From Swiss-Prot:
Protein name: tRNA-specific 2-thiouridylase MnmA
Residues holding ATP: 12-19, 38, 127
Main subcellular location of this protein, as a coarse class: cytoplasm
Disulfide bonds: 103-200
Native source organism of the sequence: Streptococcus pyogenes serotype M3 (strain ATCC BAA-595 / MGAS315)
Keyword vocabulary terms for this entry: ATP-binding, Cytoplasm, Disulfide bond, Nucleotide-binding, RNA-binding, Transferase, tRNA processing, tRNA-binding
Amino acid sequence: MTDNSKICVVVGMSGGVDSSVTALLLKEQGYDVIGVFMKNWHDTDEFGVCTATEDYKDVAAVADQIGIPYYSVNFEKEYWDRVFEYFLAEYRAGRTPNPDVMCNKEIKFKAFLDYAMTLGADYVATGHYAQVKRDENGTVHMLRGADNGKDQTYFLSQLSQEQLQKTLFPLGHLQKSEVREIAERAGLATAKKKDSTGICFIGEKNFKQFLSQYLPAQKGRMMTIDGRDMGEHAGLMYYTIGQRGGLGIGGQHGGDNQPWFVVGKDLSQNILYVGQGFYHEALMSNSLDASVIHFTREMPEEFTFECTAKFRYRQPDSHVRVHVRGDKAEVVFAEPQRAITPGQAVVFYDGKECLGGGMIDMAYKNGQPCQYI
């Protein structure tokens, strides 16, 4: 049996059941485990529910239960500078960002990893549903989590080989239901705690109210593609391509009586375009351009390959052909795709392995850019 007692693993503990079980499993496997709670957002907020103080109490309770030391570290400045400023800039540019991807890249696996090294860590571990596998050459491959419904490789797609070399994902081979069972059997304080939702680290808030604190909303016209005025929108940043709810025009129907969706934006004119039908022609595209292209292991500077891809979390994989030039890529779809959204991540897969990905800049239909920003 391997002696893990001299291997120090620092676990990012959020106060949730997943990171609690992560720490428990590593402790049971004999590792020298240290828990760390990351505080990345200020507590005093007039909207929604801020749970940082209660979450830290849960971390303390679980750490005491399983017998590990624990610390709290403040990354508020790093989060603001590296994630939140990016988040706001993307919304200003009419895009729909995915802060979780950037949060993992810059905070959980950079700022936290650096801090863990100062504690003497050999590895860091988190409660993500993903797997790492080292090949005979020592290269680490990131694989999907065994629980298809919980797999989080989409959000981890910007991690580097250097980061993956130092990372453990103890829950990767488990189903979520098994994680709950382990927590309940061990009597962990977080066993019945509900999963968190909302923006990475910021928690559950009224998104419209939250965003309006930082970006002034500019109301404008809501129109159909053919120029019919449909009323007023509350501010382009509040809408995403393919969105159905929140338009306030449910009672206005054309001849086909189908629901209305956001089908485009014109940032320069402050116009929100809407159309009827889930598969409205303006929502369909057959290629995209992406930037910030990144692979989890070494790849050539320029190459073309075929794989599957996701354009949003929990979406079924789609077959694509990818041509990479440096940190940019053209991605051509085997079948037309709906609501490809600038600012979201496109993530590439080879079977179970997550190869990496990038950020969507523009969608195209037959070579013509879709009016999505």
